[in-house]
Amino acid sequence: MPRSLKKGPFVDDHLQAKVDVQNEKGTKQVIKTWSRRSTITPDFIGHTFAVHDGRKHVPVFVSENMVGHKLGEFAPTRTFKSHVKEDRKSKRR
């Protein structure tokens, strides 16, 4: 069930404060965050966030198409190691 419209989107206060400070100064530095649950709002457009994926921080540049999604959607937490095809040389005897 989606979030109620009367509540508005969830954004961690410390993250919103960092974006507001950068918008006032006119700077575009990378913002390091662990807040994967925060919703991307229109004032995030043009900023780069380093979103934590459990191991490292993945850079995410926010564009207009991302508004309404969560930051964590753009930093995958699982790495897929492809299924290794059998090595023909080791099978030969």
UniProtKB/Swiss-Prot annotation:
One Gene Ontology term of the molecular function aspect: rRNA binding
Keywords: Ribonucleoprotein, Ribosomal protein, RNA-binding, rRNA-binding
Gene Ontology, cellular component aspect: cytoplasm; small ribosomal subunit
Coiled coil regions in record: none
Pfam families found in the cross-reference section: Ribosomal_S19 (PF00203)
GO biological process, one term: translation
This protein's record includes keyword rRNA-binding: yes
PROSITE patterns: RIBOSOMAL_S19 (PS00323)
Superkingdom of the source species: Bacteria
Function as written in the Swiss-Prot or TrEMBL entry: Protein S19 forms a complex with S13 that binds strongly to the 16S ribosomal RNA.
Family: Belongs to the universal ribosomal protein uS19 family.
Name by which UniProt lists this protein: Small ribosomal subunit protein uS19
Species: Nocardia farcinica (strain IFM 10152)
Source organism phylogeny: Bacteria, Bacillati, Actinomycetota, Actinomycetes, Mycobacteriales
Gene: rpsS
